[in-house]
């Protein structure tokens, strides 16, 4: 999985006054969990643009100076309800020998036979939770829709790779090809046309 580097500074004070001062200065207060103790730090709000405002998934390298560096993933984010300004971010520390669960986007590949026949593709799951060692986290889960005929569904059991485990029930639908109104109407008209000669035929 691709990684984004966030350069920040450890916080000496974590009270409300210092937190408000940080935000007024254009910084975001953050906490890194998962290690022996929580690490409080802050970073410029602009540093999070490529991490937060994107449909893609990333791991994060947090650099706090003096040789302190941590690998992590974004765990939780708080934004202002009106301005969408980032108020606070929680991160979770990664360790090479410990599996982690996170959401990654679904990438559709291939051309469905059902779509070519007039069906409509519906993506039921835009993201899937996967569990893997940090080195095996995928940038996305590839979903090949090529075999899907009209009315078929693609389940999570048909996507993914051995390097990671998909954390959803086997009956979870990733994508499906629905019969479009146009295709349904055409089928109905074809059925009527097929019956017409039979009705008009005299014995």
Curated annotation (Swiss-Prot):
Which GO cellular component terms, listed alphabetically, does the Swiss-Prot or TrEMBL entry include?
cytosolic large ribosomal subunit
Keywords, ordered alphabetically: Ribonucleoprotein, Ribosomal protein, RNA-binding, rRNA-binding
In Gene Ontology terms, what is a biological process of this protein? translation
Kindly indicate where the leader peptide sits in this chain.
none
Is Ribonucleoprotein a UniProt keyword of this protein?
A: yes
Would you say which domain of life the source belongs to? Bacteria
Under InterPro entries, the record lists: Rbsml_bL25/Gln-tRNA_synth_N, Ribosomal_bL25/Gln-tRNA_synth, Ribosomal_bL25_b-dom, Ribosomal_bL25_C, Ribosomal_bL25_long, Ribosomal_L25_dom, Ribosomal_uL5_bac-type
Q: Which GO terms describe its molecular function?
A: 5S rRNA binding; structural constituent of ribosome
Name one matching Pfam family: Ribosomal_L25p
The record, for SUPFAM superfamilies, names:
Ribosomal protein L25-like
Q: Which PANTHER family match?
A: RIBOSOMAL PROTEIN L25/GLN-TRNA SYNTHETASE, ANTI-CODON-BINDING DOMAIN-CONTAINING PROTEIN, RIBOSOMAL PROTEIN L25_GLN-TRNA SYNTHETASE, ANTI-CODON-BINDING DOMAIN-CONTAINING PROTEIN
Tell me its family: Belongs to the bacterial ribosomal protein bL25 family. CTC subfamily.
* NCBIfam families on file: bL25_bact_ctc, PRK05618.2-2
What's this protein's function? This is one of the proteins that binds to the 5S RNA in the ribosome where it forms part of the central protuberance.
Q: How would you summarize the oligomeric state and partners of this protein?
A: Part of the 50S ribosomal subunit; part of the 5S rRNA/L5/L18/L25 subcomplex. Contacts the 5S rRNA. Binds to the 5S rRNA independently of L5 and L18.
Family annotation (HAMAP family): Ribosomal_bL25_CTC (MF_01334)
Kindly provide the name given to this protein in its UniProt entry: Large ribosomal subunit protein bL25
Species for this entry: Flavobacterium johnsoniae (strain ATCC 17061 / DSM 2064 / JCM 8514 / BCRC 14874 / CCUG 350202 / NBRC 14942 / NCIMB 11054 / UW101)
């Amino acid at each position: 999985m691709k990684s984004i580097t966030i350069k920040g500074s450890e916080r000496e004070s974590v009270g409300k006054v210092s937190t408000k001062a940080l935000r007024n200065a254009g910084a975001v207060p953050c906490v890194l969990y998962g290690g022996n103790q929580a690490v409080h730090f802050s970073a410029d709000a602009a540093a999070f643009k490529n991490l937060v405002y994107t449909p893609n998934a990333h791991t994060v390298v947090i650099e706090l100076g003096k040789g302190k560096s941590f690998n992590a993933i974004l765990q939780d984010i708080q934004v202002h309800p009106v301005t969408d300004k980032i108020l606070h971010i929680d991160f979770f520390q990664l360790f090479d020998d410990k599996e982690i669960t996170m959401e990654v986007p679904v990438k559709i590949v291939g051309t469905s036979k059902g779509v070519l026949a007039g069906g409509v593709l519906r993506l039921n799951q835009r993201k899937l939770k996967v569990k893997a060692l940090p080195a095996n986290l995928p940038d996305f889960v590839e979903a090949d829709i090529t075999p899907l005929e009209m009315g078929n569904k693609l389940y999570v059991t048909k996507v993914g790779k051995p390097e990671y485990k998909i954390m959803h029930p086997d009956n979870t639908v990733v994508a499906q090809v629905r019969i479009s109104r146009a295709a349904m109407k055409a089928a109905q008209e074809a059925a009527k046309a097929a019956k017409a000669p039979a009705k008009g035929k005299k014995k």
